[in-house]
Amino acid sequence: MYLDQIKAELVEAQDVLNKFISDENNIKLIQEAALLISNSFKQGGKVLSCGNGGSHCDAMHFAEELTGRYRENRPGYPAIAISDASHLSCVSNDFGYEYVFSRYVEAVGQKGDVLFGLSTSGNSKNILNAIEAAKAKGMKVIAMTGKDGGKMAGLADVEIRVPHFRYADRIQEIHIKVIHILMMLIEFEMAKQA
């Protein structure tokens, strides 16, 4: 009934992953992002992560694996997903949804921290505002984007871009794969310090 559609979906997902892998720069950027985060942790910094919709879930997933665990039992790493419901509703109501992440960065971000922002389009105004706030605080910025990077292109210290122009789900599939690789590398790097 749906076997051909199922196979087509899996083949397309594989094609997007293969295209991403074929650009050696993407591999280097993942390493750069992992080292940037690890160095922040080693110097007492933390990660603030944010995104919208499915990317919001990915931001929470990343923070959870940093504070909890990925593959190894080890000390938790300092990370906060900007996902507190009362903060999100307060700022959305009082200032506008475009400020939900930047207000949080202004409140708790510090020099040496890392903002980890996800936007499949690269055009999310609230992520763009968070990047601006992070830079004003002396934070480093890692952006995970898709398509052509949108307005976020060139704004981050490290941008990991999935060059897929159709649906956001394919971009998100690569984002979560990258998040898991980042976790693995961060655990490797932080274990050197222990």
Curated annotation (Swiss-Prot):
Zn(2+) binds at residues 61, 65, 172, 180. PROSITE patterns: SIS (PS51464). Its cofactor is Zn(2+). One of its GO terms (biological process) is D-glycero-D-manno-heptose 7-phosphate biosynthetic process. Catalyzes the isomerization of sedoheptulose 7-phosphate in D-glycero-D-manno-heptose 7-phosphate. NCBIfam families: gmhA, PRK00414.1. This is Phosphoheptose isomerase. The gene is gmhA.
